[in-house]
């Protein structure tokens, strides 16, 4: 994993997909509290990340893209679209891809609250994201990418006895960025 600190020197314009719920909501809240400008992209606001060209046009003027929302393979398709738009930019850009530790599991393990089929589909979508992340991150570019793989995080949609509250997990991620 490439190490860098992006918050030490300037305020940023940050695009976050899925900013109304869960981890995305916490990133939006905590980064806004630090003074950053948030460009929130979510279905509840009428946006659809499956419209990748349109969504990428909202993200393009930003400094950091937190690629959080999942909608079939649109999360991966959006990563490619944004990366290609940013690859020849004169300034630094950052992409944080939100994946999951579920990718480490064997295929016969079911995610709490999902059917076995839904668990497999979710895992496969995140594996596709991680594969694309690895491929693009190996390219020479001013785009700095980070793969974030949370474990069980307590959100409106998910809770288990071992889950960490979303606010706590996001705070830890942001503190790591401040001290790298």
Residue ranges and their predicted role:
Residues 1-11:
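N-terminal amphipathic/basic-hydrophobic helices that include classical n-h-c signal peptides
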Residues 142-143, 147-148, 153-180:
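C-terminal helical subdomain
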Residues 79-83, 129-133, 170:
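Short-chain dehydrogenase/reductase
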């Amino acid at each position: 994993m490439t190490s860098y600190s992006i918050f030490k020197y300037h305020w940023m314009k940050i695009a976050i997909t899925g900013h109304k719920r869960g981890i995305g909501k916490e990133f939006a809240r905590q980064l806004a509290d630090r003074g950053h400008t948030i460009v929130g992209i979510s279905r509840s606001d009428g946006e659809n990340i499956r419209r990748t060209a349109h969504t990428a046009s909202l993200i393009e003027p930003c400094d950091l893209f937190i690629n959080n929302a999942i909608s079939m393979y649109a999360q991966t398709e959006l990563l490619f679209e944004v990366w290609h738009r940013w690859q020849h930019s004169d300034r630094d850009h950052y992409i944080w891809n939100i994946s999951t530790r579920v990718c480490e599991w064997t295929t016969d393990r079911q995610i709490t609250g999902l059917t076995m089929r839904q668990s497999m589909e979710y895992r496969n979508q995140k594996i596709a994201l991680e594969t694309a992340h690895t491929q693009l991150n190996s390219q020479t570019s001013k785009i700095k990418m980070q793969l974030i793989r949370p474990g069980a995080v307590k959100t409106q949609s998910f809770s288990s006895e071992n889950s960490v509250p979303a606010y706590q997990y996001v705070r830890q991620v942001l503190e790591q960025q401040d001290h790298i």
